[in-house]
Amino acid sequence: MDKKHKEQELLKAEYFDVLMPYIEDVNVTDIDWNGTDLWITDIKKGRYLSDIKLESSFIVNLYTKLSNIQNQNFNRHEPILETSFCNMRISIWHESLTKMCSLSIRDNPPFIRLASREYILETNYCSSKMLNFLENCVKAHMNIVIGGLPEVGKTELLKYLTQFIPANEKAGVYEDNPEIHYRVINPGKDCVEVCLNSVVDYERIISAGVRHNVQWTILSEAREGTAVEALLNNLSSGVHCITTTHTDDMLTVPDRLFNMIGDTKASSRLINNVYRYLDVGILVTKDETTQKREVSQICLYAREEGKNLHPLIYDYGTEYDEAIPPSIRKQFNRYGIMNPFEEVQQRCI
């Protein structure tokens, strides 16, 4: 453990005290205090009520220290405090807003919870055949969007797939809070990691990426119209991407992205560009009873002979091998992949 890491661990222990058992548990993803009760989200146990009660002095002490670090006011006039600290995303709402202070902590570990190909197959997260396909999609430089509802693990799949990006191809990683940890999970690979702020937003950094020799845009989430439009322009210049979005059906993604942009004057052009420049959509779902996460849909997007296509090659357990459009097959072939359902021999290192 290096000096910086030791200092971070000491600060964690000082700041979070009674919450440390949960913070140190790799299975815990979220810690939520609503002013009365402490709720824990665990990838194995689900969401449950803890018997720990937080004193108001603990919350006050925590937000005072965090607001000082951020040099940010936190009071009835500025009642929302959002920050990143020691690989955690922290949100605190002031008591003037919610009567009692509310705290939310999301753990963003610098490792991949989908630890290995073997783990993915053993847990039935994805079949071997479909996992081969997804890995080959990255190898073939497809543009990929990972969809799902909150807390299903979209970012974890994104992190896993980045392992197949060639080391010598620069990745631009753009996010509000450091969640992807590209440099840590892909040591030795070329990348620039950008945490967005009020000075530089998604639209500006995505547009600037081309002139910065970025070959892969890794976007934590496509959720703003201007950012989506900038991303499509980015892809039209030959940049590749992996991103996430909130959805429960990958067939709806083109319309969802189009609605984000909201430019009715250029409606046909924009929707056509979504199909032209996006290639693959992956839906991740979670069983609320068992907490089991899995890939439930794989959808392809293509514009063929003036028509927009979105065939599913996997839909809740059913495989459709022959549904790959000609333009997608051509993309695979360009990178020497004749059968996209065969295993990638190694990660790109």
Residue ranges and their predicted role:
Residues 151:
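Walker A (P-loop) phosphate-binding loop of P-loop NTPases
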Residues 25, 41, 45-140:
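P-loop NTP-binding catalytic core
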Residues 157, 161:
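Hydrophobic positions on the alpha1 helix immediately C-terminal to the Walker A/P-loop
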Residues 1-22, 290-349:
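NTP-binding/hydrolysis catalytic cores, primarily Walker-type P-loop NTPases
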Residues 143:
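Walker A (P-loop) ATP-phosphate-binding motif of ABC ATPase nucleotide-binding domains
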Residues 162-273, 286:
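Switch/coupling sub-region of P-loop NTPases
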